[in-house]
Amino acid sequence: MSEPTVTSTPRPWSQRFEGSLHPAIARFNASIGFDIRLLPYDVAGSLAHVQMLAACGILTQQEADQIRWGLEQIQQEAAAGTFRPDPEAEDVHYAVERRLVALVGEVGKKLHTGRSRNDQVATDLRLYLRDQIDHLRQALWELRGVLLDLAERHLETILPGYTHLQRAQPISLAHHLLAYEEMFWRDWQRLGRVREEVNVCPLGSGALAGTSLPIDRQLTAHLLGFERISANSLDAVSDRDYLVEFHAAASLILVHLSRLSEEVILWASQEFGFVTLTDACATGSSLMPQKKNPDVPELVRGKAGRVFGHLQALLVTLKGLPLAYNKDLQEDKEGLFDTVDTLKACLEAMTLLLREGIQFQPERMAAAVQEDFSNATDVADYLVRKGIPFRTAHDLVGQIVRICLAEGILLRDLPLERWKTFHPAFEADILTAIEPRQVVATRLSAGGTGFAVVREALQRAQARHQQPEPSEETPQT
């Protein structure tokens, strides 16, 4: 099919006006600089729309075939990176339409029958975000897999657990790693729920009131893989709740990534020494030749604030908008695109860091457990098992710790005879009860850090990690 020569058409609304738009205002008004990212989704929506128009008899089959051919050409250009939007096009929708008319002639102007850019952009956004959520869930799945592999390798490794960044109780490293796997498991589930909210088709809602043409919205939704159609046309074109929910879910993921990053940064310091950074995932200093800097987790931690800002910006944009569509909603895209890009990059970087960028130091972790009073709670528990009220036991152990600090010794340095001077309930087994490995092993309550409990928790996490994705759809890009 040859390309007919067609004269350039004005903006889709320009016939209402006598004068021309000031170039500065045209630049200010345009979104083509960033919404061009929606091109494959805009074309996909148009292909479904034209198929529906033909099925409903609004277009002839010949017209639909011509338009479909043109849209497929645009798809190929986009895939090859050769699509160049018309300089006069103010947004991706009109860029597609102008290129279509250039390819197929006047029949291309029939594509926009029965729809508005308002329901069109709402559809594009949902298609885009549904696709990106699938990619992000896959990235979370990979990160969880790395954490599970590390946990399996470190079931027997112990280290201090912290509260208030003070050593608290000995725990297993696997237990610590599985705590993050739990967070990212919740994130994976949460994104799945957001996807359900995204998977609603607004196409056919028109500018705000629907259309008088006999369209079939259910058919369009089916062709685009949507679960259902929107119920109210006013709400459909102005609803951005699903974007807020996505930004909130993304922010939570970055909270978890940032917390993990903070711990890697601390653990890589000489003050902790629990991990060392490999050359593949660290940088140096331009001045201090001895430095090895944890730039990757620092950047993840820093980028979290950027994503939080996009959530707040969207909420502020939406809070004062009357129904239905307002131009303010053009501002929903750049933050969304940046959040998606940033989150993808952070997940990829953290997965790589955990897989190849850090080496745990079990000996240093074990030594740190021996250097403190993190077994003090177990002395109190020992007395409780002897029938002494916990509060009484707690007070007594606090006094023992104070005495040890004054003498510059640890609990493990106390001989049995000294223990007995504190309370007659202490017997020879107190010496083994406060050994770090024994302390960890006895934490057998559900969800605890006991070796046996953690092994069972790991098996459950591995089993759910092997479950198939609830969505079998293949991402478009």
Curated annotation (Swiss-Prot):
Pathway: Amino-acid biosynthesis; L-arginine biosynthesis; L-arginine from L-ornithine and carbamoyl phosphate: step 3/3. The keyword Amino-acid biosynthesis applies. CDD domains: Argininosuccinate_lyase. It catalyses: 2-(N(omega)-L-arginino)succinate = fumarate + L-arginine. One of its GO terms (molecular function) is argininosuccinate lyase activity. GO terms for cellular component: cytosol. One of its GO terms (biological process) is L-arginine biosynthetic process. InterPro entries: Arg_succ_lyase_C (IPR029419), Argininosuccinate_lyase (IPR009049), Fumarase/histidase_N (IPR024083), Fumarate_lyase_CS (IPR020557), Fumarate_lyase_fam (IPR000362), Fumarate_lyase_N (IPR022761), L-Aspartase-like (IPR008948). Gene3D superfamilies: Fumarase/aspartase (C-terminal domain), Fumarase/aspartase (Central domain), Fumarase/aspartase (N-terminal domain). Keywords: Amino-acid biosynthesis, Arginine biosynthesis, Cytoplasm, Lyase. Its EC number is 4.3.2.1. It is found in: Cytoplasm. Pfam families: ASL_C2, Lyase_1. Belongs to the lyase 1 family. Argininosuccinate lyase subfamily. NCBIfam families: argH (TIGR00838). HAMAP family: Arg_succ_lyase. This is Argininosuccinate lyase. The lineage of its organism: Bacteria, Bacillati, Cyanobacteriota, Cyanophyceae, Synechococcales.
